[in-house]
């Protein structure tokens, strides 16, 4: 195997027109890897820190020249000479170089860019697809897509409180068919919204962001779109929600303010509301149903719905094994959202997925609202046989890049490719 001979970072743009970090890694035998780093709009309190310059004269303070400099001046000299396949050793070095709990010294955006680019360079040098390099010969499960087709909350400028309403084509026989179903429902939803006189502009993640009257109207409209596309809600297609409750939570009164609906709810009332929605609609997954620090609320939600609904921790667990271990011990949630930039290295990302699986939790590999053309998460989803991916609507190139990569992977795998559909929810007792 050959050593790393050069590491270079530059400032580029993400899908929201904000700067982000791109890293290139070169090896002595001609291996090359490039990675771009995503960023979130609603971020968890305990996430690894994304380093921004704060210089208001450039990009409204959102520049990443400091993170780029950290790669070029500090990280590069430390990892040049490493065997490119020594992912664990390189990631360990990156963590030690930073020396902080939350990667605030060098920036998670600097560290992650390097970690991902190293893996890509190693795969390139071995002439292997990235998913196979990361996951070995058993990497063959295509994920069920969790497609965000209606947006509210921090991802949209409207009066819907719930941040994401998603569809999951669980009845498909292959990923290709699932993607087709999702795209057809997406177009069907556009037609339904037009008929109702609603706006059909899309939000950060490619979903529509109309000014609906209530959260329930969003669910009803999606059901209508599924049926109009010729599919059966609750059989072929399930619904999923990302509530992003930390954005609704008011620390002063300890309650949830659903401003779109003009109501204030306690944790218990939020749980009761979810129970009501689950009884009326085919909802199979709820993400961040309560605030990231409302462990008692999450425990109650898990007790009430944890056997029949996937309860995903995003802000709650922030792809962090310490937070996840606490959740497992307390019996909170039954699934973790995996965002590579929440933790900052590939090794730690894989550790979180492994810990989740050992505890019988599902793992959902996810994009961020600020994305790029980088499709690494598609390969990670297959490499880890995670079974689910959350990467937006089948619209906007930054989202579709991941879906197209999954189509390529399914093609490469041929007859060995697996699409588990509803069986991906292995910990639910339906």
From Swiss-Prot:
Enzyme Commission no: 4.2.1.11
Classification via SUPFAM superfamilies: Enolase C-terminal domain-like (SSF51604), Enolase N-terminal domain-like (SSF54826)
Active site: 205 (proton donor), 339 (proton acceptor)
Gene Ontology CC terms, in alphabetical order: cell surface; extracellular region; phosphopyruvate hydratase complex
Positions of (2R)-2-phosphoglycerate binding: 163, 339, 368-369, 390
Catalytic activity annotation: (2R)-2-phosphoglycerate = phosphoenolpyruvate + H2O
Pathway: Carbohydrate degradation; glycolysis; pyruvate from D-glyceraldehyde 3-phosphate: step 4/5
Named cofactor requirement(s): Mg(2+)
Binding-site positions, Mg(2+): 242, 287, 314
Pfam families on file: Enolase_C (PF00113), Enolase_N (PF03952)
Alphabetically ordered keywords of this record: Cytoplasm, Glycolysis, Lyase, Magnesium, Metal-binding, Secreted
InterPro entries with a match to the protein in the record: Enolase, Enolase-like_C_sf, Enolase-like_N, Enolase_C, Enolase_CS, Enolase_N
GO annotation terms (biological process): glycolytic process
Entry's localization field: Cytoplasm; Secreted; Cell surface
Gene Ontology MF, one: magnesium ion binding
Gene3D superfamilies with a match to the protein in the record: Enolase-like C-terminal domain, Enolase-like, N-terminal domain
Record keyword Amino-acid biosynthesis present: no
Main location: cytoplasm
Cofactor note: Binds a second Mg(2+) ion via substrate during catalysis.
Family: Belongs to the enolase family.
Its job: Catalyzes the reversible conversion of 2-phosphoglycerate (2-PG) into phosphoenolpyruvate (PEP). It is essential for the degradation of carbohydrates via glycolysis.
Protein name per its UniProtKB record: Enolase
Organism: Geobacillus sp. (strain WCH70)
